[in-house]
Design a protein with these regions (language model features):
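Iron-sulfur cluster-binding electron-transfer modules in prokaryotic oxidoreductases
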Residues: 1-245
């Protein structure tokens, strides 16, 4: 199978190490990975801000760029969910959106498609798992606590393959961190308070690191923690899965 690697714009600009780790991890599993150099944003910021026509053009270009691949894999539950759920509506007129059926977050792809039974990675640290809203409620990376369904967590399942790691989950484990894209801009006080509450619960686990599938959530909490000098660090889950490669 041929995999097209989609690196979201904020990962490319602010956390390129996450993109590199994703590529290294997929290659270490003997997968055929290609990174299209002329890729751009998926259009989520524009759509969320109300500029739907601008997002429409970007979505159409995205679909054309990644059309040739069997899977499109991204280290971002948020962006993967946007392409999967909203691109078909954006490009519906006279065009069938194909990438929406192919795109997967890297956690989802590894857990559901590749299904590794072992990894070469090592991460001898205590880690608290952050379940992002998009990951839980749009991609099904873990079971939402408000539903009476069997409990599962694909992030935790993959982290258990890492040598030396200790995995924790905070109280109210799938409550929002307060980022929410434009929400953090339009409601900064509420967003910050939600982030503070989430960080407090992660610290209460005794963890050294907070990890999750969305750099945007981690960035939000990291900014608050740094400003308030909180004793905890942040790392994308794919960096842990690729640690030592």
């Amino acid at each position: 199978m041929k995999i097209g690697l989609f690196i979201p714009c904020y990962v490319d600009a602010l956390y390129p190490e996450v993109g590199v780790a994703t590529y290294k991890l997929l290659k270490s599993l003997a997968l055929d990975v290609d990174y299209p150099l002329n890729q751009t944003c998926c259009g989520q910021p524009m759509a969320n801000a109300g500029f739907e026509k601008m997002a429409d053009n970007i979505a159409s270009r995205f679909d054309q760029l990644f059309d040739a691949y069997d899977y499109v894999v991204a280290p971002s539950a948020s962006c993967a969910a946007f392409v999967k759920l909203y691109h078909p509506r954006l490009v519906k007129e006279g065009h069938q959106c194909l990438t929406s059926k192919k795109i997967m977050d890297v956690v989802e792809f590894l857990h559901d498609v590749v299904k590794p039974t072992s990894l070469k990675s090592k991460f001898p640290h205590i880690v608290s798992v952050h379940n992002s809203c998009h990951g839980v409620r749009e991609l099904g990376l873990s079971s939402p606590s408000e539903r009476n369904v069997p409990q599962f967590n694909k992030i935790v399942d993959l982290l258990r393959l890492v040598d030396g790691i200790t995995i924790c989950q905070p109280e109210r484990k799938d409550e929002c961190c307060g980022f929410g894209g434009m929400f953090s801009v339009e409601e900064p006080d509420v967003s910050t308070r939600m982030g503070e509450d989430k960080i407090t619960r992660h610290i209460a686990t005794g963890a050294e690191y907070v990890t999750g599938p969305d750099s945007s959530c981690l960035m939000h909490m990291q900014g608050i923690a740094k400003r308030e000098k909180k004793p905890i660090k942040f790392i994308h889950v794919v960096q842990i899965l690729a640690a030592g490669l």
